[in-house]
A protein has these predicted regions:
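Intrinsically disordered, low-complexity terminal tails
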Residues: 2-20, 25-30, 451-467
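N-terminal amphipathic, basic helical "cap/leader" segment at the start of enzyme domains
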Residues: 2-6, 10, 26-172, 176-177, ...
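Short acidic (Asp/Glu) and glycine-rich catalytic loops that position anionic groups and cofactors
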Residues: 16-19, 33-37, 282, 396-397
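Conserved beta-strand/loop scaffold segments within soluble protein domains that form the structured core
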Residues: 131-133, 137-426, 440-468
Length: 468
């Protein structure tokens, strides 16, 4: 009897669960002031947020679609439902989440992950969080981990108003303005001075509704001398119409603090993923980005770090896998503003079956950023002649006292490596999957073991049928 390969053993169905839609409320399609007012009232916004949404809509209408990057002609905002409320309020006890939603998250492993390796979990379904909880021992340290709406309306209202969309503003680009107008859901995190959160927090975003958008906002403030690892996971079932994800992440890393922000994205192949992420790092602070991008039809994602304080540091480690029908345009940006700052980008991109993978790096060294050091390394692996991989570096150096370097490599899987692994009993497909997993090891080794396994499973799923 022939043994199944480890590629075949993976259950593909868990990533493409499509629930029956039981929405409590679905906003009509389109973008008008009346729709934004309706959304604001539906969510019970304070007056300042209602005004902010309308101002953002005005900016959105004034701005043009960016004329660079992948084509988004297949995305018609007028046919996107910008708000879909699930049939439950947010719960703090997993037992109280409706069974159909609970089944979806349980198949994705969310409750199990919470029990095993997480300090807290937020689970968003369409436009609202359905579950949020933080372990007692973490809350006892003074760590705040709640949903954005509760933070905005409760005791952290002043803090939210102080930081909300100040790092990413509606005028940054058209889809930042769209986010400002229709945002819903997301997480608020505050880590007090000196607190070391020893195990990660996670938010998981699931978009189930057909022809809808998800616009969660994540705001994290890590105070002086504190540290945190935050993990973000994303998935959606595949439909024959476009879905949109245009979330926003704002990270504030105070003096001597450290934040690692990890993302594993497995959006469906009808998704337009137009996310905006930015970090502001103070003196002696450290921001670490770990990113795995495996899904979406079109992806545009360039996390940006502003190294404001002296001796602040940024590291970006990423892997992108573009398969058939995918155009993933990703990368990272860094602005060196303080003295003796450092940044390091280390990325891997994989393309197969005609997929297009583009890596854009942007390094800016301000005039006063003496002693800045930056290193960019991008390696690409193309699995066939139909695929494409591009590297587009940009450097703006305004001081002579800086060290900046860029390295790019492109290659393919050697026949010798395939032959060697097959001589050890592997099938050709398994051999290719193993080599690709090793190529992406720079990201998986930075994740907790449960998430490293998940990422390697996603690579194996993408590699299925890669022969011929």
């Amino acid at each position: 009897m022939k043994e199944k390969s480890y590629v075949e053993d993976i259950d593909r169905s868990i990533y493409d669960i499509r629930d029956a839609e039981h929405d409590a409320f679905r906003m009509e399609e389109g973008l008008t002031p009346a729709i934004i007012d309706k959304l604001s009232k539906e969510k019970g916004d304070p007056v300042w947020m209602q005004q902010f949404r309308l101002q953002s809509l005005q900016i959105y209408n004034e701005m043009a679609v960016p004329d660079w990057g992948p084509s988004i002609e297949g995305l018609d905002i007028d046919h996107i439902a910008t708000y879909v409320r699930p049939n439950t309020a947010m719960q703090n006890d997993w037992k109280n989440v409706p069974q159909d939603i609970k089944d979806t998250f349980e198949r994705l492993g969310i409750p199990e992950a919470e029990r095993k390796s997480l300090a807290g979990v937020g689970a968003q379904y369409d436009s609202e969080l359905v579950y949020h909880n933080v372990k007692d021992e973490v809350a006892a340290q003074g760590v705040v981990y709640t949903d954005m709406e509760s933070a905005m309306k409760g005791e952290y209202a002043d803090m939210v108003r102080k930081y909300f969309m100040k790092l990413v503003t509606p005028r940054d680009h058209k889809f930042a303005a769209l986010h400002g107008a229709v945002w819903s859901g997301g997480s608020f995190v505050y880590v007090p001075k000196g607190v070391q959160v020893s195990i990660p927090l996670q938010s998981y975003f699931r978009l189930n509704a057909k022809g809808a958008g998800q616009f969660e906002h994540t705001l994290i403030i890590v105070d002086e001398g504190a540290s945190l690892h935050f993990i973000e996971g994303c998935s959606a079932p595949k439909y024959n119409v476009a879905n949109l994800h245009a979330g926003c992440v704002e990270l504030y890393v105070k003096k001597g603090a450290k934040l690692r922000y990890s993302t594993i994205e497995n959006w469906s192949k009808n998704m337009y993923n137009l996310n905006t992420k930015r970090a502001l790092v103070e003196e002696d602070g450290v921001i670490e980005w770990v990113s795995g991008s495996f899904g979406s039809h079109v992806g545009c994602l360039y996390p940006m770090s502003v190294l404001k304080g002296d001796n602040s540091r940024m590291e970006f480690t990423g892997v992108t896998f573009a398969g058939s029908g995918q155009n993933l345009d990703t990368g990272a940006k860094v602005v060196h503003a303080g003295k003796n700052t450092s940044s390091y980008m280390n990325t891997r991109s994989i393309s197969k079956s005609g997929g297009i993978s583009t890596f854009r790096s942007s390094v800016v060294v301000e005039k006063g950023a003496k002693g800045a050091k930056s290193s960019v390394s991008c390696q690409s692996l193309m699995l066939d002649s139909q695929s494409r991989s591009d590297t587009i570096p940009a450097m703006d150096i305004r001081t002579k006292d800086a060290s900046v370097g860029h390295e790019a490599k492109i290659g393919s899987i050697s026949n010798e490596a395939i032959f060697y692994l097959m001589s050890r009993g592997m099938s050709e497909e398994d051999a290719r999957a193993l080599i690709v997993s090793g190529f992406a090891d720079n990201v998986s080794k930075e994740l907790p073991v449960e998430y490293a396994v998940e990422m390697n499973n996603l690579i194996r799923l993408e590699m299925k049928g890669s022969i011929g």
